[in-house]
Amino acid sequence: MPADLQSIADPRLILLAWAAGLALVAGVVSLSRIVGPGFSWLTAGVSALVGLPAVFAEGEWWARAALLALVLGALWARNKALAGVVFLVAGTAYLVEAILFSGALSAVTATLALGGVTGEMVLGHWYLVDPRLPRLALRNLALVGIGGLAAEAGLQVALGVGVTGGALAFWVLVVTSIALMTAVVGALRYPAYSGVMAATGLSYLALLTTLGAVFVGRALVAGLGPFDLT
């Protein structure tokens, strides 16, 4: 954890972690060969867009390497094995940049939470087109998101976030996010098409609350703006 706690609430870190999570999801899904290259193109594009601010920051060469890898992975998306490996390299490069910026724990928890929730939401749209696809990947991404949110909560407790005062907003957001993603897992057990529809809709809400939980928890620790531990 960095000595300057304000770095863990810096928007650049959150964007780097988000980009890392998306790129890693693109790599894993590409290697699993469950959907076509369209998912890789979309996820790589969103990852590149989210990570773009870091690319133009001074000295962030890992982020630039990640962007290059995303472009190459998108170009090779029809070769799923090769593209999957390149996307994993991109995600790792973004994660390294985030770790250098704010420390390993802060970067990894945000990457897991944002990557799992966003990846489940995006991949869910392919299941809406073809609900016969195996749902294991969706369930696994949802579980990764839940694990990341739980780790994020543990990190904030370790950094001194309590359960009263201004910290209440964080706990409402993180508990709501975990509840929504748990509901996603439950909806995916329902074999009908409506189960995938419900899971995808719930993941949209979970993404909003997850973003809020990640930022508010860190802002509490850093003492930024109106956020206060008391």
Model feature map: region roles:
Residues 2, 8-99, 107-126, 143-159, ...:
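Hydrophobic cores of alpha-helical transmembrane segments in multi-pass integral membrane proteins
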Residues 126-138:
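Cytosolic, membrane-interface loops and tails of multi-pass inner-membrane proteins
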